[in-house]
């Protein structure tokens, strides 16, 4: 049962990401990629820098940092932002690569993951 709850929690996180991305697109459009691929990369790097900074303050123990940095500007908020920008980046790359089956195929697709 604990095993299933982990997957259900991740499914809920993914669904929450999709809903947040839809809402953000209504307000901001595609502003995340307005400055091209380099700008999109820098946005990802900036989000990771925030995660890295908080973990570094706790001897690189990201779990401990997650317990300390909570709330709207907390570690989980930065992790969620990074994950959402990564989803946007993946979607952009895959939609730009239509016809390239190697790029479009998801890892573990055959197993139903």
Feature locations, PLM:
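Intrinsically disordered, low-complexity regulatory regions
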Residues: 1-113
């Amino acid at each position: 049962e604990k095993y299933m709850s982990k997957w259900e929690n991740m499914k809920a996180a993914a669904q929450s990401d999709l809903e947040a991305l839809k809402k953000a697109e209504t307000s901001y459009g595609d502003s995340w990629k307005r400055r091209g691929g380099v700008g999109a990369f820098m946005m990802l790097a900036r989000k990771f820098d925030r995660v890295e900074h908080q973990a570094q303050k706790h001897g690189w123990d990201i779990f401990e940092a997650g317990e300390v940095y909570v709330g709207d500007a907390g570690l989980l908020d930065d992790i969620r932002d990074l994950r959402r920008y990564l989803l946007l980046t993946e979607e952009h790359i895959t939609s730009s690569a239509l016809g390239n089956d190697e790029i479009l195929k998801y890892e573990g697709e055959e197993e139903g993951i």
